[in-house]
Amino acid sequence: MMKEMRKKPHVLIVEARFYEKISDALLKGAVSALQKAEASYDTITVPGALEIPAAIAFAEQNKISYDGYVALGCVIRGETYHFEIVANDSCRALMDLTVHKRLAIGNGILTVENEEQAWERAKQDDKNKGGFAAEAALCMIALKKRFGDNR
């Protein structure tokens, strides 16, 4: 079906699996929000948060056309500077895709101090950041269409 004929958004969820159980919780929230909106979706996985922007860029070049993207993952501070690199660079790369490629992306990459904070944000019955990221993507898809980018 051609994208222009679709009434409901078609979304790609890109899920980093570095913290698998936390990622599973984020995914449940995102899927629930997309199903509630009657959006169709595909899901792919990548090793970690740094790979999410590249996966979205690859998908954008694919024959399958997505209206928007949901980025899901978790970065927990450790003892080295690696946390700052992953947190900052994954977010910056997503913003670059959003601004320069005009992609509708909901950012659900958690950047937290510890696993307890991650669970608080990942669980559907708590902060539900996976669901929030999906809702943000849907909002940006609608905004993009409002301004005439029906690509």
From Swiss-Prot:
GO molecular function per UniProt: 6,7-dimethyl-8-ribityllumazine synthase activity
EC identifiers of the protein: 2.5.1.78
A cellular component term, taken from the record's GO annotations: riboflavin synthase complex
SUPFAM superfamilies: Lumazine synthase
Alphabetical list of InterPro entries matching this protein: LS (IPR034964), LS/RS (IPR002180), LS/RS_sf (IPR036467)
Keyword terms, alphabetized: Riboflavin biosynthesis, Transferase
Gene3D superfamilies cross-referenced by the UniProt entry: Lumazine/riboflavin synthase (3.40.50.960)
GO BP annotations listed: riboflavin biosynthetic process
Function: Catalyzes the formation of 6,7-dimethyl-8-ribityllumazine by condensation of 5-amino-6-(D-ribitylamino)uracil with 3,4-dihydroxy-2-butanone 4-phosphate. This is the penultimate step in the biosynthesis of riboflavin.
Name of protein: 6,7-dimethyl-8-ribityllumazine synthase
UniProt lineage: Bacteria, Pseudomonadati, Pseudomonadota, Alphaproteobacteria, Hyphomicrobiales
Gene this chain is encoded by: ribH
